[in-house]
């Protein structure tokens, strides 16, 4: 058959591994159709895509209206009827022809030339089908048809089947669509408390036709593992040992007789060759060919996370040859040399002697160095993955590094991240704590389910293992810390059964699969855990979890903390004391500008039905489109947080009042996170030796009230600015016990060497005048803070200070210090500013700061000054037309100080008109009635 040019969407792309003579057709692009026999409707289709997106583009459903609705799937026929994609193709004859699908969401039957090819039932797996014989016998134009089933309907059918596993009532968590735990699909597609329940279907990743002649091979997947000689996943690697490179390639095609493998490793920046030659100990197992080599331990330049050194990367090319030295397959991957280790080992005698409390460690070590993990949790950035572009993720990751974050927890259950997202993380130095896609549920453990999961685990572990940004594999989200206690309360007598099922899936199945495919990554069975008692890889349950076998006064594992009782939001005695904080937070509203993207003007008020229905905290718990009762609880929590601590907005204009309320919820959220992050970072020098803070959550999936610090279009909330500030390397922090009046000031550093400097403590009233005798507080305190440590520099009680009026007082803390960033040769200066008020913001005797703002085209900076009083929470806001962030925001500004602030534009144009519409406000504006 002759290949028609118009039918070949794109010949071999640079990212496709191939050999000369191989024919690969990338099926991405237009030319597909989306059909429904039930509706008798056909519209143009695309690949990759999902059904909703093609229907949006075809005008069948309205994207704006549909995105407002809570349950699009209930109101449109999407997901209830089979969706079929067709692609006409006319291909030349080759010895073998394969269909390769990198991702089908989720339940499909596939035909080619009207012949059944196969079926799929896992969104997270790569599938390939041999259609050689079908093509040879095909008498018509070959056509690919992919029939997609409704995931909610199929999940319900599985749940109703006689052999379906059941759990005690009240244990399984339904957000909107039920029964998500029976299927291997993105769990949040069925609804979550921060996003919609669209349950999309479609070919969400690329697909290919692969044709080979003779002994040609197509590379399906590649597992490159870089580790120190002798390294074992759960033990600290010996940094003095040479590097072992293990290259394993999964192929399509006949495995050659006595294959050989060669490798070339080049510096990605300079092109210089680090190593080249034949791999040793080449073995064949199934369709995988594997070989190893050794590299001198000091030869490669190490890869470091952001803030700890350079992100040195290498291009690694692996070639497979037959016994005649003919090249059969070649693949190139970009990688880096690093060790990353999650230390869960028992506290040693040396650590006890240093004042660290007994128990077990729970922290990360990069290239042998313990470090403080600063970051957040990333959720799916869109309800439809085909809309997630490289440019969009680059913008998001720019915000991550600009926010002084070095780690993201890739939450389950979204989806395993695309390779290009790991590539971006490699470049920017962002560690990605990755998880298998199980969350807040108990899962089946029948043979078919476990077999499906095993293939999913092996494929994804091998696929992303070469990325130096990969930091951890965790079994799932909150399974040990939430689900096991829930089932214990629901069925105490059957608890041991469910613990056994948990161990069967996450320890007996997944752990060995991870260890068999990587030596370089640690595995934890659950995101939040008390750690393990011991590891015995030859045992049926190779890791003995600690569970509740803890000792009072000892600390184990990481913490997960949410408390919606706003009366204790700033009482740090309620915060958990542990080794690492992997989740904590509180929700807030997005900005007015973001609401205007999705909501009609008449709905822009706090308790409008549309605003309330887009708030999924708390979720409906089922298929209801009138979730006002549960939503009102979450809306009420935000309201109570504002009313307890901040001036209550009361604008005469309804839209302005709505905007002020949105901003007020962000102030509460940001201050609450700041309070916790300061507390956790201070823990680095406390007995708990706390070495990680990952707040919930980084970004939004749509325009709605959520825990996010970055809104759907990339606009930063107050939270992300405040987190950026408090994640600086050296910070000064006040800790106030508002019950006893005790005030402590600490300096905290995450540098790897001691740092020195001074902190100026200055009391002023809210007009900006200094308070006499500095209220009895020393004006300057010198400090020395140890590596990864904290030190108390000042302690007092508010009752002992000579403050004329607590409501008219603010303490300005200004740090100036010197230290050395990791892997740098010279010291640098560090500055940080914080503040403290002896009453909550709502009780302050605020003065109008009379803010003024100007812009210099020459310096491209805004200048802000207060001419009337102290400006608290000084907030620069920008209009639509560009996306980016200010160099600093939500800061305290004293009268007479001119502060220059630049704007980093990530998208759009900063025009003269745009600049004129940039505004500035403060806490004063929140209480003023226009």
From Swiss-Prot:
Pfam families: Glyco_hydro_2, Glyco_hydro_2_N2, Ig_mannosidase, Mannosidase_ig. Residues 1-21 form the signal peptide. It is found in: Secreted. GO terms for molecular function: beta-mannosidase activity. It comes from the Eukaryota. It catalyses: Hydrolysis of terminal, non-reducing beta-D-mannose residues in beta-D-mannosides. It is an enzyme of class 3 (hydrolase). Homodimer. Belongs to the glycosyl hydrolase 2 family. Beta-mannosidase A subfamily. This is Beta-mannosidase A. It comes from Neosartorya fischeri (strain ATCC 1020 / DSM 3700 / CBS 544.65 / FGSC A1164 / JCM 1740 / NRRL 181 / WB 181) (Aspergillus fischerianus). The gene is mndA.
């Amino acid at each position: 058959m002759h290949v028609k040019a118009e039918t070949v969407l794109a010949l071999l792309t640079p990212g496709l591994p191939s050999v000369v003579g191989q024919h690969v057709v990338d099926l991405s692009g237009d030319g597909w159709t989306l059909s429904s026999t039930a509706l008798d409707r056909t519209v143009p289709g695309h690949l990759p895509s999902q059904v909703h997106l093609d229907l949006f583009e075809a005008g069948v459903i309205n994207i704006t209206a549909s995105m407002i609705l809570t349950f699009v799937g209930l109101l449109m026929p999407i997901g209830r009827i089979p969706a079929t994609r067709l692609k006409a193709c006319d291909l030349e004859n080759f010895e073998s022809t394969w269909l390769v699908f990198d991702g089908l969401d989720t339940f499909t039957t596939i035909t080619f030339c009207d012949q059944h090819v196969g079926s799929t039932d896992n969104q997270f797996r790569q599938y390939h089908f041999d259609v050689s014989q079908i093509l040879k016998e095909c008498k018509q134009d070959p056509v690919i048809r992919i029939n997609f089933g409704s995931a909610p309907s199929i999940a319900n059918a599985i749940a109703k089947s006689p052999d379906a596993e059941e759990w005690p009532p009240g244990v399984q968590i339904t957000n909107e669509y039920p029964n998500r735990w029976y299927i291997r699909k993105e769990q949040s597609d069925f609804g979550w408390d921060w996003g919609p329940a669209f349950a999309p279907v479609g070919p969400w990743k690329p697909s290919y036709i692969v044709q080979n002649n003779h002994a040609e091979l197509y590379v399906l997947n590649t597992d490159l593992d870089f580790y120190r000689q002798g390294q074992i996943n759960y033990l600290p690697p010996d940094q003095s040992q040479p590097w072992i490179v293990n290259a394993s390639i999964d192929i399509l095609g006949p495995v050659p007789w006595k294959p050989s493998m060669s490798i070339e490793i080049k510096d990605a920046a300079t092109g210089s060759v680090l190593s080249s030659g034949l791999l040793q100990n080449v073995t064949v197992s199934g369709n995988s060919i594997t070989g190893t080599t050794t590299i001198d331990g000091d030869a490669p330049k190490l890869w470091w996370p952001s803030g700890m050194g350079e992100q040195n990367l290498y291009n690694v090319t692996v070639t497979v040859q037959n016994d005649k030295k003919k090249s059969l397959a070649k693949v190139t991957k970009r990688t880096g040399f690093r060790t990353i280790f999650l230390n869960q080992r028992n506290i040693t005698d040396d650590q006890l002697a240093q004042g660290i409390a007994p128990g077990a460690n729970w922290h990360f070590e990069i290239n042998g160095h313990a470090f403080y993990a600063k970051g957040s949790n990333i959720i799916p950035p869109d309800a439809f993955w085909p809309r997630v572009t490289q440019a969009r993720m680059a913008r998001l990751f720019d915000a991550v590094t600009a926010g002084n974050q070095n780690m993201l927890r890739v939450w389950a259950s979204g989806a395993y991240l695309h390779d290009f997202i790991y590539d971006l993380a490699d470049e920017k130095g962002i560690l990605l704590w990755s998880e298998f896609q199980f969350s807040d549920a108990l899962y089946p453990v029948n043979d078919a389910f476990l077999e499906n999961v095993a293939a999913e685990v092996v494929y994804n572990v091998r696929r992303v293992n070469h990325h130096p940004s990969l930091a951890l594999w965790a079994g799932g989200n909150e399974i040990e810390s939430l689900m096991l206690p829930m089932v214990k309360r629901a069925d105490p007598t059957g608890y041991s059964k469910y613990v056994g099922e948990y161990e069967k899936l996450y320890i007996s199945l997944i752990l060995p699969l991870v260890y068999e495919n990587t030596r370089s990554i640690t595995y934890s069975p659950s995101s939040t855990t008390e750690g393990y008692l011991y590891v015995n890889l030859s045992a049926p349950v190779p890791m003995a979890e600690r569970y509740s076998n803890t000792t009072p006064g000892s600390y184990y594992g990481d913490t997960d903390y949410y408390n919606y009782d706003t009366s204790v939001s700033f009482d740090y005695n309620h915060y958990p004391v542990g080794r690492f904080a992997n989740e904590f937070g509180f929700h807030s509203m997005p900005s007015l500008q973001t609401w205007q993207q999705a909501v009609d003007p008449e709905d822009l008020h706090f308790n409008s039905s549309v605003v309330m229905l887009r708030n999924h905290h708390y979720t409906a718990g089922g298929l209801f489109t009138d979730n006002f009762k549960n939503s009102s609880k979450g809306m009420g929590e935000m309201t109570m947080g504002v009313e307890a601590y901040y001036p209550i907005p009361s604008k005469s204009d309804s839209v302005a009042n709505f905007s002020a309320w949105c901003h007020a919820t962000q102030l509460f959220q940001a201050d609450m996170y700041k309070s916790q992050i300061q507390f956790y970072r201070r823990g680095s020098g406390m007995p708990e030796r706390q070495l990680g803070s990952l707040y919930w959550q980084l970004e939004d999936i749509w325009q709605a009230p959520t825990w996010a610090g970055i809104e759907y279009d990339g606009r930063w909330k107050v939270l992300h600015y405040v987190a950026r500030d408090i994640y600086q390397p050296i910070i000064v922090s006040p800790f106030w016990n508002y019950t006893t009046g005790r005030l402590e000031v600490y300096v905290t550093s995450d540098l790897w060497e001691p740092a020195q400097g001074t902190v100026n403590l200055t009391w002023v009233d809210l007009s900006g005048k200094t308070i006499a005798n500095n209220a009895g507080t020393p004006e300057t305190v010198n400090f020395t803070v140890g590596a990864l440590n904290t030190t108390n520099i000042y302690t007092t009680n508010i009752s002992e200070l000579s403050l004329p009026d607590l409501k008219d007082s603010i303490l300005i803390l200004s740090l100036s210090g010197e230290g050395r960033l990791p892997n740098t040769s010279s010291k640098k200066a560090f500055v940080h500013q914080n503040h403290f008020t002896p009453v909550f913001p709502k009780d302050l005797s605020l003065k109008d700061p009379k803010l003024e703002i100007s812009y210099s085209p020459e310096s491209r900076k805004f200048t802000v000054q207060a001419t009337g009083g102290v400006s608290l929470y000084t907030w620069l806001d920008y209009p639509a037309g560009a996306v980016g962030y200010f160099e600093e925001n939500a800061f305290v500004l004293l009268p007479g100080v001119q502060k220059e602030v630049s704007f980093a534009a990530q998208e759009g144009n900063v025009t003269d008109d745009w600049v004129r519409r940039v505004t500035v406000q403060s806490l004063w504006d929140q209480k003023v009635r226009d």
